[in-house]
Amino acid sequence: MPQLPSRNPTIGIALIVTAMLVVPFMDAIAKLLSAQYPVLQLVWARFFFHFLVVTPLALWRHSPIGFVTKQPFLQVGRGLFLLAATVCFWAAIKYIPLADAIALLFFDAVIIVALSALVLRERVQTSRWVAAGVGLIGVLMIVRPGFEAFHWASLLALAAAVFFSAFFLSNRVLTGEVVPLVALSYQSVGGFLVMTAIMPFIWVTPTATDLALMLAIGLIGATGHLLLIRAFEHADASLLAPYLYAEIIMQVVLGYWLFNDLPGSWTWLGIALIIIVGIFLSIATKEASRSDNQPIPGAHL
């Protein structure tokens, strides 16, 4: 394991804010392109170009020996959770505003509370269950089932939150198996292979401009992950957790700028509740985490 650089919390905060301001452009590009291309083709681009960027870098820094792991199938399987989350989320944002979808995605911090108790058999404090209930109220404010504002695609965003929860829990199980950059390479393999197998059946030949945008999707995703890795090397998860929610702000800005979407009053209230609960649960997660250098709920890339 290579020695970590000297820690500088200010640099860590700057890196994570940069990541959270950049990554929403990936989702915005996917939403724009989904009008002309299948969502699955865009997901392929996200994993294919991610793989092309990260894997050579990981091999250069850590050599093939660094890829040795006791659980290679679980490493790749972890990436399949990320694949499923990406498919569901990008299918959702094709139909609903970016801000609504990302707010529902941040509900994964609440889902992790339940899965930690049910799957990992962890003891969950009463305060965290209460916070989970408050977060659920926030979700209901955004989704509003039974009301005219309800859209079925909101359920896809919630499904994405479930898959992201499984992804984060698998990260916890695999903590320390390989260095973060190698883990980042592993998580792209499953998505890259699965989506490449599907491409011959759904491929729509992109224009040169759209191909460049697809490349940008993969580059933004890989860059965001690398920025997060560096951020967690410099600062504790508990310090960085609140800054993850800059992603929601940027999604609102891009949604208004590109699609003329602005959240309504109920959605704003729901977003506020989910942010408050998410920050509380992310900080609480640090106490039970085995490593502060692992991504925490909220880093959706």
Which residue ranges define each predicted feature?
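Glycine-/small-residue-enriched transmembrane alpha-helix faces in small-molecule transporters
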Residues: 1-41, 149-173, 293-301
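Specific alpha-helical transmembrane segments that line the substrate/conduction pathway
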Residues: 41, 48, 91-121, 237-255
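Helix-helix packing/entry segments at the starts of transmembrane helices
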Residues: 102-107, 174-189, 225-257
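C-terminal-most transmembrane helix of multi-pass membrane proteins
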Residues: 2, 249-301
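Hydrophobic alpha-helical transmembrane segments of multi-pass membrane transport proteins
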Residues: 21-25, 29, 57, 76-91, ...
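Structural signature of hydrophobic alpha-helical transmembrane segments
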Residues: 37-52, 91-109, 150-163, 207-221, ...
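Loop-to-transmembrane alpha-helix entry segments
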Residues: 105, 121-141, 147, 151-154, ...
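Membrane-interface interhelical linkers
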Residues: 1-18, 51-77, 126, 176, ...
